[in-house]
Amino acid sequence: MSEDTRLMCGLTLILVPTIVYGGLTILGVLTSGSFGAPAPTGLSPLQVSLYRAGHAHAGVLAILSLFLQVAIDYAQIPTSLLWPARLSALAAALLVSGGFFAIAHAPALRPILYTGVGLLVAVTLLVGIGLLRSR
């Protein structure tokens, strides 16, 4: 494992407690506080769905970010794109999940979600093509 991969994987894993906290928040939302988690009041069904989507994407994209960090070591990617790829993998996880939470309360923040999706598409294509090109 390269030093850059170790650094980015470490940063990603440090963010996992925020996903755990989000899970506790979702538990409170879905159970109306009956499992000891605080129950927010006044959420619409759409907001609850966006909370669920944000939390689900956070976990899945954190795992994908970890995978991409390792895959970048094996992909044939131009040196000038290595760090942008590493940062985009982690940023996409943060922006997509954060975008769902943001638009639950402020629909005008929708570009956060779309920026994350754009980064996710770009980095997965870059790494995928780089892996196919490597020998």
Model feature map: region roles:
Residues M1-H55, G59-R135:
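Polytopic transmembrane helical bundles with strong interfacial aromatic enrichment
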